[in-house]
């Protein structure tokens, strides 16, 4: 997308409108040693929380349907930032801090604790969050996260 976008006006139009959804905001969980909520063995700045505006995360929204582009460093250990896994927050941390077992592929108990500590306890909020694990923390430049439609094309239905 290019040009000026009145993000707040767009958000107001989409929020609460039946049959249409969108990304409200993306949160990067820092998980720095010594910080409040630090979880040992959970990665630093590689867990993203993608908050949707209206509806629960679609069950078929997974790592193959999340794209991250951006970054300026040419170091292949940093860029491109790849999506390792992506699951609804309730699959990772449960609706009230106790996920259904077994945990999804690639997710461990430290991920559950990290995500649980970063989200409010509200089941309604947790249902609207997609958790994305990245291959690196990237660099300090701008990145764009996109949700893709079936087959990795376009946008998801209803977005």
Regions found by a protein language model. Name each.
Residues 1-159:
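Intrinsically disordered, low-complexity, polar/charged repeat-rich segments
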